[in-house]
Amino acid sequence: MIELSHEEELRYNRQIILKSVDFDGQEKLKASKMLIVGLGGLGCAASQYLAAAGVGNLTLLDFDTVSLSNLQRQVLHCDARLNMPKVESAKIALEQINPHINIETINAKLDEEKLAEIIPHFDIVLDCTDNVEIRNQLDRQCNHMKVPLISGAAIRMEGQVSVFTYEPNTPTYRDLSKLFRQNVLSCVEAGVLAPIVGIVGCIQALEAIKVRLKIGKNLCGRLLMIDGFSMNIREIKLPTNME
């Protein structure tokens, strides 16, 4: 059984005093294994709060390197680490945030066969990518392995978050993508305002913790939509098995 050190008890005190977390929940977070796919704006925001919250084992997956245009919103990276693999840059920053956790990196673009090999080793997967092909691969494999997927997206001044637990009669990312039949733009094409990716990434981290600890009401079956321009936040119910 994994236990907290005295220093960790002090570090996580403000979470431990929450009745829904307590010592048992914090120890469960320490024992947890989460995969973060994409270390751009969403992944940077989500990973730093998961690290700070004491998720004991984070694996960072990305195949890109840090560029100057990333620094406007990808807050774990910096000028000194330009051209460094994003996973290595993020690891350096996260280890400074919390030296008590274990951080592994995968600097590669994994095909679906390789994703199928690694996903069963995790309790939660966070989809922080802007790549439709990878999103669909993660959805298929997480669905097959019944590993919860926390999905986020942000563009312009808009963001969205949903949770897929793959329990019976719950929607998948495939259902969501069918609901929004449209061409997917990237930040390169449409632009993005920095704070919106932080908001979405933080919500992803929050939902990951809630799902792992089985607390609160998570976003399974719902899509949270954030319009930063008008500061309007709404949700829609997602259909299941949409043809």
From Swiss-Prot:
One of its GO terms (biological process) is Mo-molybdopterin cofactor biosynthetic process. SUPFAM superfamilies: Activating enzymes of the ubiquitin-like proteins (SSF69572). It comes from the Bacteria. InterPro entries: Mopterin_Synthase_Sase_MoeB, ThiF/MoeB/HesA, ThiF_NAD_FAD-bd, Ubiquitin-activating_enz. It catalyses: [molybdopterin-synthase sulfur-carrier protein]-C-terminal Gly-Gly + ATP + H(+) = [molybdopterin-synthase sulfur-carrier protein]-C-terminal Gly-Gly-AMP + diphosphate. GO terms for cellular component: cytoplasm; cytosol. It holds the Pfam family ThiF. It is an enzyme of class 2 (transferase). ATP binds at G41, D62, S69, N70, L71, Q72, R73, K86, D130, N131. Pathway: Cofactor biosynthesis; molybdopterin biosynthesis. Keywords: ATP-binding, Molybdenum cofactor biosynthesis, Nucleotide-binding, Nucleotidyltransferase, Transferase. One of its GO terms (molecular function) is thiosulfate-cyanide sulfurtransferase activity. Its EC number is 2.7.7.80. Homodimer. Forms a stable heterotetrameric complex of 2 MoeB and 2 MoaD during adenylation of MoaD. Catalyzes the adenylation by ATP of the carboxyl group of the C-terminal glycine of sulfur carrier protein MoaD. Belongs to the HesA/MoeB/ThiF family. NCBIfam families: moeB, PRK05690.1. This is Molybdopterin-synthase adenylyltransferase. The gene is moeB.
